């Protein structure tokens, strides 16, 4: 009985640490923003987060991690809202590593062609 309890406690602590690391934003400057304009190369609507690749005119490819499906659906974003080929402007917190091409703390996405706009209302 005691071993089972200790095993359960250890497992819950490991899970808590993993969840905390998953949502750690220490690699980003949360108090700053950058604007990146480009074309969506691919987009994947699946949990835990919707992801897409964004190619700039300079040929740089950024891997973007958006919110989860439920959060996006509450914001009226569905699997057909954005698609490969859409030109967008992404406003996000920049990574502390200037060579990083990963953007996670998305604050805003605009599609200039039709004026569509998404703004973050909750923390990812």
PLM feature spans:
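Bacterial N-terminal signal peptides that target proteins for export
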Residues: 1-8
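N-terminal signal peptide c-region/cleavage motif recognized by signal peptidases
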Residues: 16-18
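Transition segments tied to proteolytic processing and entry into folded domains
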Residues: 20-34, 47
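Conserved hydrophobic positions within beta-strands
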Residues: 38-40
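Short aromatic-glycine-enriched beta-strand elements
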Residues: 46-55
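A short macromolecule-binding patch
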Residues: 58-69
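Short nucleic-acid-contacting surface segments enriched for D/E, G, S/T with interspersed K/R
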Residues: 74-90
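OB-fold/S1-family single-stranded nucleic acid-binding modules
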Residues: 95-122
């Amino acid at each position: 009985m005691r071993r089972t309890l200790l095993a359960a406690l250890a497992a819950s602590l490991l899970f808590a640490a993993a969840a905390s690391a998953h949502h750690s934003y220490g690699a980003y400057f949360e108090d700053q923003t950058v604007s990146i304009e480009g074309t969506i190369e691919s987009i994947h609507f699946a949990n835990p987060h919707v992801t897409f690749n964004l190619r700039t005119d300079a040929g740089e490819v950024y891997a973007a991690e958006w919110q989860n499906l439920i959060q996006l659906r509450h914001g009226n974003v569905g699997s057909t809202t954005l698609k490969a080929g859409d030109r967008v402007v992404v406003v996000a917190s920049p990574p502390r590593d200037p060579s990083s091409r990963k953007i996670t703390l998305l604050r805003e996405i605009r599609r200039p062609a039709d004026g569509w706009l998404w703004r973050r209302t909750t923390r990812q």
